[in-house]
């Protein structure tokens, strides 16, 4: 997984563990995917949690729009009912705020609303492809500040570490008019009711492998998962710069004056 059980709370309850987030153009809108429950997708969704897609339309790493999915406890057949809310403005950053209900349904069913929103929540095959030899080589290079050594990798023998495994997925397809911007920033979070009027953010995820490759354990995975993207530059900028600076010299060569590439 690109974001697999990287906090103590996520390890305790994989229903709150985000493995990957995907964003792409669909047939009739933008598709948002949040995968959770890596390697244990039969546990469903937590009934006291918020599963949220945060959308930044202002290029300031602050949500202007949030799609929130909540679930009720599992029924005797194992399925759960869910509600999708849309929150805008100040409500998009307030977990105690109420939004406009966009859709409702049950897990394992595709729901399509009159305004074109499509929703699915349920089990799915894990689409994340990762070859163990390649990721080990990259992690070793970042750790040691050395060139990436792929001498042991044969592309013809590439093997997916997660072939045949499942996740629990939340998939939204949202028409452009409900997003309101052509360029957006997106991340997903899970948060758990603390029973004291607040919410404890358990996991966050956006681009794959960021927390794994750059080893944010130096600052603490739990700290990373509890913070927001708007604070990343201050919290993790030096860490990322240091690791990239150590890796770049061994993997590049200085240009020769007057030389041309052939």
How should these model regions be labeled?
Residues 1-262:
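Surface-exposed extracytoplasmic segments
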């Amino acid at each position: 997984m690109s974001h697999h059980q990287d906090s103590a709370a996520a390890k305790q309850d994989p229903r709150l563990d985000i493995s990957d987030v995907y964003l792409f153009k669909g047939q009739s809108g933008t598709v948002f995917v949040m995968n959770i429950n890596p390697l244990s997708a039969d546990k469903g969704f937590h009934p006291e949690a918020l599963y949220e897609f945060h959308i930044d339309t202002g290029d300031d790493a602050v949500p202007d729009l949030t799609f929130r999915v909540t679930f009720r406890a599992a029924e005797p057949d194992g399925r759960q009912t869910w509600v999708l809310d849309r929150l805008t403005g100040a409500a998009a950053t307030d977990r105690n705020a109420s939004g406009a209900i966009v859709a409702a349904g049950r897990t394992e069913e595709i729901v399509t609303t009159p305004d074109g929103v499509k929703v699915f929540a349920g089990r799915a095959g894990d689409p994340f492809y990762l070859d163990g030899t390649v990721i080990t080589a990259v992690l070793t290079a970042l750790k040691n500040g050395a060139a990436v050594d792929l001498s042991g990798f044969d592309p013809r023998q590439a093997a997916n570490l997660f072939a045949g495994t499942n996740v629990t997925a939340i998939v939204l397809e949202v028409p452009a008019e409900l997003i309101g911007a052509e360029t957006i920033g997106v991340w997903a979070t899970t948060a758990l009711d603390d029973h004291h009027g607040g919410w404890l953010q358990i996991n966050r995820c956006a681009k794959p492998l960021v927390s794994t490759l750059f080893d944010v354990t130096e600052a603490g995975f739990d700290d990373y998962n509890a913070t927001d993207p708007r604070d990343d530059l201050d919290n993790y900028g030096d860490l990322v710069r240091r690791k990239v600076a150590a890796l770049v010299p061994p993997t590049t060569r200085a240009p020769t004056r007057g030389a041309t590439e052939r």
